[in-house]
Amino acid sequence: MVFDYKFFNQRDDGVHCRGCTNITIQDCEFYTGDDCIAGCANVNVLVTDCVFNTACSGMRFGGTNILVRNSKFYGPAKFFFRGSLSKEEKRDGAQAHRPHRVNMLSAFTYLADFSVPILEEPGNIIIKDCTIDNVDRFLCYNFSGNAHWQTCKPLASIKFENIEAKDIELPLTAYGSAELPVDLALKHVNVAFREDVEAVDFLHLVHYGNVRLDDVHVTAKGKLHLVKYWTQGDIILNNVTCSAPENEWIVAAEEEFYCKAI
């Protein structure tokens, strides 16, 4: 299945695939009122040279062997969020107007629900050579149980490489499963939080196995922690800088994180 040189303008989900194998999405531009690319239980997926602009998630996606590369994620959205419109309004092509929001919630949000069987273990998701600009967060993996789109099967591993991210507002969330802790890798990643953010954590970690940061640089004007964790796992730092005192880089959470479903 190949989508190439497509222009998605003011739709719900731009592309939605479930239970598919060997998908290529290339040279596409997404300007959507819902997720740009969505779906779960997909295997062998390539997304390359695309533009993502939405009031929801750039990708709300799950599967095995997924590569996203050479793409741009940015907000605010061209169109207002369409998720609050009724089915009739969506069917009739109604436009979302104020006070619907235009902030982009996440570059990548994990998806694994019960709509189709998930036959292979989700994991080996790689996002590389991308820019992320004015997006609330660049990962939302929330297997805490309150996000019904992320309750079927947990994610085994995800990696970000060669990422330039700026004007980020919220932590990168990796809330895995106790039965299958998530492995997270970040390599050659630069992150700058929005200047008006008074206090923020770069990573929120729960039920993680191995978290590795190589050549990662994080800056914020306000108070910053590099990692805040609730459960124990392995955290490896190599050539990392952070605009916070080093003794405040990695701290334990005082209570379990509440992850808002998005």
PLM feature spans:
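Extracellular/periplasmic carbohydrate-active domains that bind, remodel
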Residues: 1-262
